[in-house]
Amino acid sequence: MTKKRKLEGEESNEAEEPSQKLKQTPEEEQQLVIKNQDNQGDVEEVEYEEVEEEQEEEVEDDDDEDDGDENEDQTDGNRIEAAATSGSGNQEDDDDEPIQDLLEPFSKEQVLSLLKEAAEKHVDVANRIREVADEDPVHRKIFVHGLGWDTKTETLIEAFKQYGEIEDCKAVFDKISGKSKGYGFILYKSRSGARNALKQPQKKIGSRMTACQLASKGPVFGGAPIAAAAVSAPAQHSNSEHTQKKIYVSNVGAELDPQKLLMFFSKFGEIEEGPLGLDKYTGRPKGFCLFVYKSSESAKRALEEPHKTFEGHILHCQKAIDGPKPGKQQQHHHNPHAYNNPRYQRNDNNGYGPPGGHGHLMAGNPAGMGGPTAQVINPAIGQALTALLASQGAGLAFNPAIGQALLGSLGTAAGVNPGNGVGMPTGYGTQAMAPGTMPGYGTQPGLQGGYQTPQPGQGGTSRGQHGVGPYGTPYMGH
């Protein structure tokens, strides 16, 4: 029932509304139309505002996107700029590294190649290289050897001044005798003077034929530069950097103090190793020593004057040569070129040996060059002694054994080669002695072919003087 009543009430209300609308006056209808128009205008304004807001939002979104793109572009630009800045910074760091530090690891060949290329492209570099070469005495100092005993400094100046202006000249003399030691030095003011003088290395000065070379090449042996002795050594050894810094010093007596030697050679530059080659038991020199400098320039300075006076000894310096190890015949000689070389032989008679001996750089007498001699006997003395023993032996009651031993020892000390009689006429090495001339020799054949092998109990040619080997070569020591 209740539901039915509600439905009826709703129907009655709906029926009343149209009736009320019909009962509205024209004025009310007009007002209603105006209200509807106002409401419609408000709706249109709201819609227009919404459209404007949407357009503004779209513009703002576009602006935000543009700003984002600009920020991204700016970020990328900053990154590129930062990378470029860091790259240039690293390059500047590389450029700031000192040139000397860059060149130190380079080999000599690399530095020479760079300098040559730079000199070919830049004239100022070539001029600077020439200036440095002119200042360095290595290219201007000449060593001359084979001079006579009476050669003076004035003689050298007169002989070499024709090649260029001389800055300094010195003929080396013995302090005691006052005679020339057979060599000297000439320092020119320019490289051209030294080059002109070396165009003809052999020169006749006085009555002697001399030879000259750059002093930086070191001493000479037998008239040939020391460089010739290195022919058998591999080329890579002589060109190695270590070899360029090492010098060899000969004629170093055992009485010399190694520490004083080190101080003496340190004035040419810092020494890395040395003195090397000392006796492992006594700690003293064995006739030679080696020094290794920190740089090759220091070694060159030490070799500018190859012959140095130290505590009364003449030390002979040269560039060390790393040659092959000595064989059995040279096992007691620490330098492979020293076996037949008088300059390497230790001799207590410093600087007073005969021509060809270690104390002088004179051209040896060809008559005394037949064998490896240590001393050359005066022919007059040998002839007198031989004649005395041959003709007066019986009258003086000489013991034959003593006579033979005397002749044998003289032959050994003089380095006499029985085949050629070094230092005396050839006939004295091979002449025969008639039987009966000397008592006790009648039962022996003549001294055919030289001195006979000594009998038991007799002295012979195998026993020489103290410090002299069986063939006349001075004893080097172990």
Curated annotation (Swiss-Prot):
Induction: By wounding. It is found in: Nucleus. Residues 41-75 have a biased composition (Acidic residues). Residues 457-470 have a biased composition (Gly residues). GO terms for molecular function: mRNA 3'-UTR AU-rich region binding; mRNA binding. Pfam families: RRM_1. Residues 442-456 have a biased composition (Low complexity). PROSITE patterns: RRM. Interacts with UBA1A, UBA2A, UBP1A, UBP1B, UBP1C and SRK2E. Heterogeneous nuclear ribonucleoprotein (hnRNP)-like protein that acts as a component of a complex regulating the turnover of mRNAs in the nucleus. Binds with high affinity to RNA molecules that contain U-rich sequences in 3'-UTRs. May function in complex with UBP1 and contribute to the stabilization of mRNAs in the nucleus. However, unlike UBP1, UBA2A does not stimulate pre-mRNA splicing. This is UBP1-associated protein 2A. It comes from Arabidopsis thaliana (Mouse-ear cress). The gene is UBA2A.
